């Protein structure tokens, strides 16, 4: 039997790939399990789109929501399209509950990702804004 695991992430706990792999492990080797990650524009979007578009991932250090350094990963396709998750640099999972204040937070790091992708030849940009 073929089983398709097409899941979105579980916010703050598992990526779509981690969740699908856990299901695959639970099913065992008796059945063929096909993993197809999904995303809604938030966390997991880069993973899902890079897999289906055969894009390379690049991780860089950028400015987080409160000027702290964070690592952000984005994808680059062969036709110079960048795949970016806004939440990797300005996501709600990067903010402690007591820090939730949009007037003090910044999205500067998202611009740094765009600039890095541009400097590496990207001229088209897919930017998921979920989870930010």
Question: What feature does the model see in each segment?
Answer:
Residues 132:
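IQ-motif-like calmodulin-binding regions
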Residues 1-129:
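N-terminal loops that bind phosphate or other acidic moieties
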